[in-house]
């Protein structure tokens, strides 16, 4: 209901079934992944002679044209075609959970920066927020590229996501910022390629409470000459209560929004950290 109901207000969904696409009707025999000498095959669970490996891979490659329009992909947990990770792979009678669905593998190889998640994992508040945030960032980037990318626009984009990146991995975020600054004389297309790949790789890392506290305190510093001692104490206590898990992330963020509305700051007004996705999704309420 969250996917189709809540997210449906912001996303347009397209369903796709690889099994149906290769001609397997419904009802149909279940499939499984089997390790053979020449690699992993997708075969019938009861009929080993039903081997759809080549058809599945070929069909997955044929979906490239519409997949390149996507901003995210929700896959099916444990599916031999659509499982993102830990899919059962049989070698004899003993399965190991170390596989990836054939369709999912081709998708992720062709679009390594595309936000991908399994529907079952979206029940985890941290993974859900992470995936949806990446989808919005991916769409923002696509719009930026469509408008025509310039060095100035790329620098501005990075400035907007600086604190978001720091909440995921401070060291890699700083390294990315330094590398981007050093690349100011390079062709923007070349810079954009490695920059976006690293941006999405950093965002894929789970943001931590420790990193969030660091970012919140950094933002607090912008207000040191703007708010009185009572407000400073309240803000510091709120951040600390988040640190020790007495409050969700939305509380210190809401308080920071309040202060920056009263005391606007040009740089903070542009940052996506305080508004990474629509408030109606309530994704920060459970972090």
Task: Tell what function each PLM region has.
Residues 41-52, 88-90:
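Short, basic, glycine/proline-bearing loop/turn elements
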Residues 50-57, 94-101, 105, 170:
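Short, amphipathic alpha-helical segments
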Residues 65-146:
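Internal, conserved structured core segments that host functional sites
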Residues 1-14:
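Short catalytic helix/loop segments, enriched in acidic residues and glycine
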Residues 12-15, 115-117:
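Conserved beta-strand segments of alpha/beta enzyme cores
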Residues 116-287:
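Acidic, Ser/Pro/Thr-rich low-complexity regulatory regions
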